């Protein structure tokens, strides 16, 4: 599956690049490897009954990625660039989107990582935004059914001023 890459160097985001390479070339001192300078999202593209492809919560995922970036002092990817990359990768991989009646979808993984080679705890100077996709089966294998769970809205799993509210690898 094709991936799209966008790099931020010298304070500006570069042009969208498309690649079929499944490997990233990183410096061993990249901040994503040592200081947690990484953020990701997860979206799905579904094929509708009418054959049209729909992407679930595109705008909301762009906003959440930006919120995560603010929270861990990473460069924020503009919403339009996020959407452009997602739409491009989905279009290039449309043939892998499962048929409507299967309950399956095309999983979309946007990933933003700090790539500067630096030692010391401070934000990266360079970033790479990558999007890759893979077909996945239904999330709920047995279909949708009710469960006897309680939702408690007053509880926060995150430590005060911690990173628990952000979509970063350290929380998984």
Regions found by a protein language model. Name each.
Residues 101-113:
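Extended, Lys/Arg-enriched charged tracts that mediate electrostatic binding to polyanionic substrates
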Residues 95, 99-100, 124:
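Charged mid-protein connector segments
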Residues 1-92, 111, 118-172:
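Helix-start/capping segments and mature chain N-termini
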Residues 99-103, 143-144:
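Short helix-terminating capping/connector loops at secondary-structure junctions
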């Amino acid at each position: 599956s094709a991936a799209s890459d966008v790099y931020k160097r010298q304070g500006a985001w570069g042009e969208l690049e498309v690649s079929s390479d499944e490997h990233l070339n990183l410096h061993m001192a990249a901040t994503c490897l040592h200081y947690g300078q990484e953020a990701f999202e997860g979206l799905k593209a579904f094929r509708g009954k009418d054959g049209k492809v729909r992407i679930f919560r595109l705008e909301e995922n762009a906003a959440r990625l930006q919120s995560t970036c603010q929270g861990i002092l990473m460069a924020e990817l503009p919403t339009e660039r996020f959407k452009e990359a997602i739409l491009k990768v989905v279009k290039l991989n449309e043939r892998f989107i499962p048929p409507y009646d299967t309950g399956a979808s095309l999983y979309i993984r946007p990933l933003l990582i700090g790539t500067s080679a630096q030692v010391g705890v401070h934000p990266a100077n360079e970033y790479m935004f990558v999007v890759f996709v893979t077909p996945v089966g239904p999330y709920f294998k047995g279909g949708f059914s009710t469960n006897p769970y309680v939702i408690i809205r007053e509880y926060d799993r995150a430590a005060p001023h911690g990173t628990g509210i952000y979509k970063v690898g350290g929380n998984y």
